[in-house]
């Protein structure tokens, strides 16, 4: 759930930033994060285990909120680059769903609309076992959207998995809205008016620096002259306007097997 088929090695480093901010020293966790940083992807199971270990270091605290709040544009990968170049929050959410559908052939997330708001939610049956994972994912998403669309990310409600904590104030203060727990469809409801608010004229002062930072991050993963990246870009630019940028079609266009393309992505 939460936009995750896999966790990128770069995204996992938000946990390291959290450790630095909290002044936490854990050789075991540091070693595991160092290993994760060298990998293109980290399994969801391994990420959950890292989060459980972090939670044990700070019992009773809203660790998921703290870790997710550390996200920066360089942690968001290619999807982050697409969201960064969206016109508003609504466009960003629809862009994500489009990418999810085209590349995986299915939408794990569900985007619904009514007169007051837009709700993005994911099915989740794991309850407490997935609570911190869900908190980190939703907090990171909101943090990123607030960085990109100041004034366009007003929330009406948030639902999370897991038991209700004794102190819900940190959650309500961060999200700025009522927060419920024990949900099997965790998600976020955005204000229907704010979500359509154009970002033109309301960009954060550091927007261009953020965009350059993201470009540099992508260049580190695949240099500007990388033939794979150039070929992928060419095929996507040709396929998306035709409404057919599916994983099989992109693989054929690049003369790769589906398995090879998935691994390279």
What are these model-derived regions, one by one?
Residues 1-118, 140:
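N-terminal low-complexity or simple alpha-helical regulatory segments
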Residues 74-194:
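N-terminal regulatory/effector-sensing and dimerization cores
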Residues 9, 13, 90, 131-139, ...:
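Short, well-ordered alpha-helical segments
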Residues 1-3, 126, 217-221:
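A ubiquitous short alpha-helical element
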Residues 165-265:
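Extended mid-to-C-terminal alpha-helical interaction segments
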Residues 22, 61, 103, 148, ...:
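Solvent-exposed amphipathic alpha-helical surface segments
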